[in-house]
Design a protein with these regions (language model features):
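C-terminal regulatory domains involved in ligand/effector binding and gene-expression control
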Residues: 1-117
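Residue-level detector of solvent-exposed, low-hydrophobicity positions
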Residues: 28, 43, 51-54, 151, ...
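Generic alpha-helical propensity signal that fires on short helical segments
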Residues: 36-38, 102, 162-163, 168, ...
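Functionally constrained cores in energy, signaling, and assembly domains
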Residues: 58-60, 138, 216
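Accessory "access/gating" subregions that flank catalytic or transport cores
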Residues: 71, 75, 79-186, 190-200
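C-terminal catalytic subdomain
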Residues: 192-216
Length: 216
């Protein structure tokens, strides 16, 4: 895994060192201490518990997220969605080879152009191109939203952006969809894993697909 060593010095004397591992999914492990466990702010770990609470209190998932996270989550998710859209639009404008020795060609722009030319620009093909655009920006070291990880960053943005453009959903509905998606991603992270390093690519992309499905 990606590793960070931090050394402490006083003058020229080394006082100590800590080693940190990035094990994927936003989680870290401290050498000799095991996995760092973040404090859970949500009161329920399983969705069965969450659903029971929602039914007993006649609440929707977005209302529950607002209750736990506070109103500040709305502004934050506006930033998140703006970044998702920016990344898609940026990725669609670029062509050429991605960085690295494999010489992989970008595909998002050519996919969009091909579908426009042959008149078959249906929604699932647009979403296909949007997902490529985000993933290729990630492969180029550009800014993406980890949803839930860099490796799966193309799924949720492409679905939300594609559906909003196609059906003209108001922005408020997209923000609520992000709340739902985030809750489901958090449930997976706390009960299983969203880390490709820990559980393979299916942990990342499978979770992203679940988040997108829940958001819809």
């Amino acid at each position: 895994p990606n590793t960070l060593d931090i050394y402490a010095y006083l003058d020229d004397t080394e006082l100590g060192m800590h080693r940190f591992y990035s094990i994927g999914g936003g989680s870290i492990e401290i050498d000799g201490e095991g996995k760092y466990v973040e404090e859970m702010i949500y009161p329920f770990k399983k969705f069965t518990e969450t659903r029971k609470y929602l039914e007993e209190n006649n609440m929707t998932i977005p209302e529950y997220v607002l209750q736990v996270e506070g109103e500040g989550i709305v502004d934050y998710l506006h930033e998140v969605y703006n970044r998702m859209k920016t990344t898609i639009k940026s990725g669609l404008t670029k062509s050429g080879k991605l960085p690295g020795s494999l010489g992989v060609e970008r595909k998002a722009q050519s996919i969009m152009n091909k579908f426009f030319i042959d008149g078959s620009m249906i929604l699932n093909k647009k979403i296909f191109a949007y997902a490529y655009a985000v993933s290729e920006e990630n492969a180029s070291g550009e800014i993406v939203v980890t949803a839930p990880t860099c490796g799966a960053c193309g799924v949720l943005p492409s679905v939300l952006y594609g559906l909003q453009k196609e059906y003209q959903f108001p922005l408020e509905k997209i923000i609520e969809a992000l709340m739902v998606a985030g809750l489901f991603g958090n449930i997976v992270k706390n009960n299983a894993s969203i880390s490709g390093a820990e559980a393979g690519c299916q942990a990342e992309v499978g979770t992203a697909c679940s988040m997108a499905a829940a958001a819809c």
